[in-house]
């Protein structure tokens, strides 16, 4: 009996440790200042080498996080563990100014297995979005030619999702699945102008859900065709916000909570189709994200 009690404890410990590992900034794009940040295109793994597509892929040995219905080909005799990391390099140029950055860190883990002959499950944690930018502006002071005011905008942090996937093989060719979980994290944004600094810190959390369907067509020969469809509704993000103001020249300081405009996770609709043979895998995805309910994080 002790053996069966240790498994959930080990999983809980693994989740806690993995969340602390992946809770690192993973972008340097200025557009990450809007909404909930720059969305993670994928959890990585084998699909990263295919352009982060795979909604229609359901293959043995693959833990598909793009479509919750596409995990019904996992090995039925053992647990499957998946741990990964990501790295990125970016170079920016504007007139005669150049800058570059390199980022890399562990970013995901997942554990999957078959529960019953037609029921498969997976638990994991991975980045959902990331905020990371540094923008400097220069404006001439009105009425004072040759005098300029410099402003510095900075942002860091991100959101991370913990999820539980359940997939059911309704028939030999048709599978359905659902992802349920939470998204949480902290985003810090600041604006510096001369000696004044305003910092916004927002702790965010939201319920997360997406749904998937996967179907394998009845074909003859070596070619196997399949299609997948996923949908994630737009859900509200809850905030706990804090504003800090400081001015080194006047020794003024303010630290208080504040209310920002309501933010939402974007609605996501995705579809994919794939063709596989013994040597080739050809697949294509279409993804639609609706950001219309969001504004800049500053508001």
Give the label of every model feature segment:
Residues 41, 52-57, 73, 239:
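Generic structural "secondary-structure junction" signal
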Residues 24-49, 94, 110, 114-299:
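Outer-membrane beta-barrel porins/channels
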